[in-house]
Each structure stands twice: as C-alpha cells, then as structure tokens.
C-alpha cells in the first residue's frame, strides 16, 4: 500500500498580521486531516512596509523584491517551527504551498500580486514549493479569487443540504456548497480590514481584541446606510475585492469628523455582518447552516451582529464542528492546493471565480 503524504500550507492574508503554516495529510487527492499549526507574527516594520506598497509610490519594484525575500525568510522560519513541533524533517514533506502576501488585486486588469520569493522559499525550506496560485485562474478569465471554495467543497459539502462557509479575514468571502451542484463563492466585502484600520488609527492597536472597544459604541444608522449603498454590493457574482476598494480613506469620505470613535467601530462591525447576511440571503437563500472560519470568529461583537442579522434563518457554527480549527482553514487550503498540483488535479473553483474552465493552479519550484 502506498504511504500517505504530508503537505504544508502557508498563508498570510489581507489583515497582514502574520503567517500561518498548517500541516495536512493526504492520500493522493483525498483529504485525511490537519495535524499541526505554527504562526509567526509580522514585525511592525514589515507590516508598515507592506501596507505602504498598497499605494503607488517611488521605487515599488525594488521594494517589492526586497520585501518578497524578507517574507520568504519569515515563511521558511514558520515552516521550520512547524516541522520541529511535529518532529519532522523537510524530507518528510511532499510539497509546500505558499499563497504569498497580496499587495495588489486588480482582476479588471488581469493581475493579482502576491509577494513571495518562491525559489528562495524552496531553498530555505529544502521542500518542493508551489505558489503563484491566482495567476492561472486570471489567465483563464477568472477573478483569481476566492480560491478556497473548491477546498471547502472537498471538506465540508453535505449531500443532504446547502451549506455556506464564511471566511472572515481582512476581506470576508463565502463559499456556497449545494448538495447537487458545483460550489461557488465570492468576496462579500470588508471582513476585519476596516475595523482593524480604524482601531490602528484611533487607538494605535493592531486590532480590537475581543471586540472590547466596539462593544462600547452604538450603531450609527445613517453611516451604515451610506456604507451599504456602495455599488460593489449590488454587483452580481463572481466578484472579488480588496484594499484597493475598501480602505480607510474610503471610509473617511463618509464621515463629518464629529463621530464618536467607538460608534464608528461599532458601525463597521454591523457593516461587515450586514453585507455577509445580504450576500448569503441573495446567493444561497436555501442555506440553513453556515460554518465560520478566519480571525473574525474571535470577535464576539461581530459574531453577535451576524447572529442578529441572520436571526433564526441560518444557524451559525465554527468549522471546528467539522473537524478543522477556524484559524487553520486558509493555510490548510493552500496545502491542499499544493497536493492538487502534485496530483495534477484541477483545484480552481471556476464557478466561483468566473474562469472559463477548471485549472491546475500554481507553479512549482525545486530546491
């Protein structure tokens, strides 16, 4: 009997808080489970430099290459810590899948930029490395995002009912998993991104831990209505978005300057929840169960807002109820995509991205 294979996935999302690495076990293209996790936070200087690259400026090409190398060294460190925690050697790993750090996402121009020096990462880890997952989907006419619905379908689909899977990172995205049709999904809009940016600007904290500051505020109905009127939310799917559309300077155009900072933060929580609810109600009206993953699940104010918006129509759960830690899901998805690459299995959720066909995503690098 052929032995099972181990893969590592590394993910750093639009929240730009650090890198997650997850170890998974596969039997060819069959998922067997996730076995370990490591996390390395971004140093403050690195995070600031990455955020600076979101805006056009001088010497972007040089800065992007230097940051790609720094990120890849940090990714390699995270992978090494994961291997050490599991008493494994690089030779035990079939492949490593690395998403990289998104700094520009422009599907309307046919590109999405994730920083990672993949040959350097392969050299540092001494593991065959797969990356640049979004480019193949974009080349086939897709949005290049979200890429996780195919993974969600492989793990979480139920043949009796429609399920929704919600990932709340910097951007929130949903996967809709019908029992008898292909999975699809899209970005619903901001997840934690605006809340984090507001918290950083007004309290000099990386994020609102446990929603403690939002809990002290009140929802501003007029502000909420103005935010919800953004045309993105009326666009049909497939669609994807990012900081290019929903940055702090966008929010500030709706403020008169006299708002209480706690009230604005509280309103942003409801804004995320309402856009998710509207998206699910429109695209998956028959879904009665929604499984949540990503950093947003740790914010009790946001979770309460989601529960209030959905009411009794949809039951909310953690992906832990389906045997995958909500903090591990995205990194595990890129380990799974690396396994798809190795086994020549199309991993693209083309019904979610709008690509013309299923594609084998990524490019491989030997060490």
From Swiss-Prot:
GO MF term set: ATP binding; kinase activity; phosphotransferase activity, alcohol group as acceptor
Span of the signal peptide: none
Catalytic activity annotation: 1,6-anhydro-N-acetyl-beta-muramate + ATP + H2O = N-acetyl-D-muramate 6-phosphate + ADP + H(+)
Pathway(s) of this molecule: Amino-sugar metabolism; 1,6-anhydro-N-acetylmuramate degradation; Cell wall biogenesis; peptidoglycan recycling
Keyword Transferase: yes
Binding, ATP: 13-20
GO BP term (any one): 1,6-anhydro-N-acetyl-beta-muramic acid catabolic process
Top-level EC class as recorded in UniProt: transferase
InterPro entries given in the database record: Anhydro_N_Ac-Mur_kinase, ATPase_NBD
Record keywords, A-Z: ATP-binding, Carbohydrate metabolism, Kinase, Nucleotide-binding, Transferase
Pfam families according to UniProt: AnmK (PF03702)
EC id: 2.7.1.170
Function: Catalyzes the specific phosphorylation of 1,6-anhydro-N-acetylmuramic acid (anhMurNAc) with the simultaneous cleavage of the 1,6-anhydro ring, generating MurNAc-6-P. Is required for the utilization of anhMurNAc either imported from the medium or derived from its own cell wall murein, and thus plays a role in cell wall recycling.
Family stated for the protein in its record: Belongs to the anhydro-N-acetylmuramic acid kinase family.
Name of the protein described by the UniProt record: Anhydro-N-acetylmuramic acid kinase
Species this chain originates from: Neisseria meningitidis serogroup B (strain ATCC BAA-335 / MC58)
Gene, per the UniProt record: anmK
């Amino acid at each position: 009997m052929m032995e099972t294979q181990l893969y590592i996935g590394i993910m750093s999302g639009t929240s730009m808080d650090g890198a997650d690495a997850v170890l998974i076990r596969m039997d060819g293209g069959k998922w067997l489970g996730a076995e370990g996790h490591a996390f390395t936070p971004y140093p403050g200087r690195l995070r600031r430099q990455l955020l600076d690259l979101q805006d056009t400026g001088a010497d972007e090409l040089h800065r992007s290459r230097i940051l790609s190398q720094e990120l890849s060294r940090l990714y390699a460190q995270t992978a090494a810590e994961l291997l050490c925690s599991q008493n494994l050697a690089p030779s035990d790993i079939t492949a490593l899948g690395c998403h990289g750090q998104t700094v520009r996402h422009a599907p309307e121009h046919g590109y999405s930029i994730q920083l990672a020096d993949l040959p350097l990462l392969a050299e540092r880890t001494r593991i065959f490395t797969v990356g640049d997952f979004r480019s193949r989907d974009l080349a086939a006419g897709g949005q290049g995002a979200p890429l996780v619905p195919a993974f969600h379908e492989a793990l979480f689909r139920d043949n009796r009912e429609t399920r929704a899977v919600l990932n709340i990172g910097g951007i929130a995205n949903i996967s809709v998993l019908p029992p008898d049709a292909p999975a699809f999904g899209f970005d619903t809009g901001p997840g934690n991104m605006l809340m984090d940016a507001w918290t950083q600007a007004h309290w000099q904290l990386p994020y609102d831990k446990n929603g403690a500051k939002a809990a002290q505020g009140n929802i501003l109905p007029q502000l909420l209505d103005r935010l919800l009127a953004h045309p993105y939310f009326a666009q049909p799917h497939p669609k994807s978005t990012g900081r290019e559309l929903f940055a702090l300077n966008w929010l500030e155009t709706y403020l008169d300057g006299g708002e209480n900072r706690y009230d604005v933060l509280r309103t942003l929580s409801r804004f995320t929840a309402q856009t998710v609810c509207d998206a699910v109600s429109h695209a998956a009206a028959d879904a009665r169960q929604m499984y949540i993953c990503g950093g947003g699940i740790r914010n009790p104010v946001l979770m309460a807002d989601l529960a209030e918006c959905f009411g009794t129509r949809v039951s909310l759960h953690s992906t832990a109820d389906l045997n995958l830690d909500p903090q591990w899901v995205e990194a595990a998805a890129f380990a799974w995509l690396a396994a798809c690459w190795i086994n020549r299995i199309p991993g693209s959720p083309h019904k979610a991205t709008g690509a013309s066909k299923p594609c084998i995503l990524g490019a491989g690098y030997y060490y």
